Amino acid sequence: MRMLIFTYKLERYIKNKILPKILVVPDRDKYQIKGSFRRRIPYITDIDIVNNVHPEYDDTNIYQRIVDLINSFTNDNQIKLIYVICGTDDRFLLTEYSDEEIEKIKILLNPTELVELNNVLSKYQDDLNKKVFYINEIIWDLYKLRWTSSEVLAGKKILRGGIEVSFQDVVKNNSILLLQYFVKIEYYPIGFDIAVRYKPINLITAYQNAAFYQLKLANYSKEYYFMLFPLRFYFKNDPTISKQLEYIIETKFGLYKQLLVRIDSYRTIYESGNLDLDTAKSIIISIIKDIRKLNGIDMNIIDKIQEVSNNSAGQDKIIAWNTLLTQLYTNINKSVNKQSKKYFTRYINIIPKEDRKLCCLEEEHVLQSGGINFESTNFLTKKKLIY
């Protein structure tokens, strides 16, 4: 068995052995575990933590602490700091979504991004909400600054168009940064997202924004499994239905979600340039072991992955696996959403029609639009922490 299952022993290991290495301040009263790991969900996907480090650290000394953290595990094969996310490139900040604003960002996009933007402008010219949403999908990674370890150590980053920004200047103009780690736990790496709050700030609005974003994405992408998440939120005060939805999402289909996250982890580490062959192998082996437990999966893709394992070498393996995992992701996503349709239909029909818009859920819209768009942006890979 390669799947990572929650146990109290594992929880103690993470709290006692991992968090002291990766948190800015590891004192127990200085961090809160959020999300599914806090709820002790069986299938572990990733771990979200808020680390409150003020007043011990603020914008005058947090930079050196991040540098010390990076240096402390430079030779630690278990821990990879993929990105430090802090600051924005306000050239990509749209307020009115006017033609003038959009033309200004077009000159900063690469050819692929430009094609995507033009497609959105054409497809959603009569739907402002969706146009705004999908434009932000395209430019989000350009707007939010993602710093590699080497850029943090250098103290600077070169943006599109050759503009240089200072890490310390960015830190002074913000209140929170995100440390995006991957840590090998047992068989393969899982993600740790550490939100480091180094100035007094209320995060309620940030969490509300993130939750509302996820609600819209679940609806816009027409994916029944991910649309169960806002249903669970809606029924949070009904213990019976909430428990039923929790079981469906996290236990019945928990391995589907975990495998989707594993594939996304592979792709994220690969795209960051941090994926070595041993890490790639560990993820691939774990996927091959566990994928056979799922229903509705095209095993031809698995056969191709195994063929690459047997016949390709070195970097060629990593590249070929990345391509095949993209196909497998779509296949798993399609399967779990098809199986979830009956549950979505059952619970959406309990909600009064006047409340469905509050949940960004309208069954009629989903069905009339032609069903699920499996090629669309999906709920998991675009999970955002909006700070």
From Swiss-Prot:
Keyword Aminoacyl-tRNA synthetase in record: no
InterPro entries xref list: L544-like_helical (IPR048545), L544-like_NTransf (IPR048543)
Keyword vocabulary terms for this entry: Virion
Protein name per its UniProtKB record: Uncharacterized protein L544
Pfam name, any one: L544_helical
Gene Ontology cellular-component terms listed: virion component
Localization per record: Virion
Highest taxon in the source lineage: Viruses
